[in-house]
Structure formats: structure tokens, C-alpha cells
Amino acid sequence: MKLLLHICCAPCANRPLADLKAQGHDVTGFWYNPNIHPFTEYRARRNTVRDYLQEIGVPLIEQNDYGLRPFVRAVAEDIPGRCVKCYEMRLFRAAEVAKAQGFDGFTSSLFISPYQKHDLMKEVAEKAAETFGVEFFYQDFRPLFRAGQDFAREHGFYKIGRAHV
């Protein structure tokens, strides 16, 4: 399957990428994260993703409009509902790009995190898939979380909150 993998950061993406490729999928990374701030954090994560995907030969589609203002507008009116807004912005864009660029489906590295609202993300991704007429490829990557963090540490990946200025 030709899959678009939305990527939040390299530490979360490395094991899903390896696993999806091992399953025989043709994977392309997708960077769109208007929720990340400050800009130094955004840049550090994006650059680590770029470098890693280039190193392993995986194509990357980047949407580099630093969308903090639209993100803040989207969540400011509904602070308790900010998670769903954040998931919607990223997963709906991933579905839209997947459909527009001829991918069979999409998924996200967010599904590796034990800290995210997994069921809510899945629900949002399914709505995005239905909206754009593209398959949401669901896989619970959480069992790979520790291995991904270990891999990131061993390879010196930038980790959240330690921006390189």
C-alpha cells in the first residue's frame, strides 16, 4: 500500500516507519505541525525529521507554513477541546494531501504515543478519511514506543524541549 505517514517528530516516527516498511508498504513522510511552538522547537523537530528521512531514503512532503496563528485561533475558543482541534488540523490535512497526491491511505506517528488520546485520534482520522475519500490505515504503534525512544537516544535525535538554536 502507498501510505502517507504524518510525522510529529523523528523519535515517534522511526519505529512506525521501520514497521510499515517491513510490512511492505511504500511510505512517504508528511510534515505538517502548526501546533508546535516556539519556532525554534518547530525548526529543530522538522530538521531532525528531514535529516532522518533523507538518511533512510524515505521521501518527505513538507507543509512548512508555520501555522501557529491559525492553530491558536482554532483552539483559543475551546481550550477543553483543544486536543480534537489539533488532531483535526493535522489529520485532515494528511488525508487531504494523501488523496490529492494519489496515496492509497494515510496514518500518523502520533499513534505511537502513550500520552496522546488514542481513541479520539482514531475517530478524527476516520472522519478525515471519509471526508476526503481516502483510506485511514490504522495501526496501534504504542507497543513500539519504548524501542522508538531508545533508537532516538542511540542515534542522537533531537528530543522535544531541547531546541538547537
Predicted segment positions?
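ATP-dependent adenylation/nucleotidyltransferase module used to activate substrates
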Residues: 1-144
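Conserved small/polar residues in nucleotide/adenosyl-binding loops
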Residues: 163-165
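Short, surface-exposed amphipathic charged segments that create phosphate/polyanion-binding patches used
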Residues: 74-81, 148-158
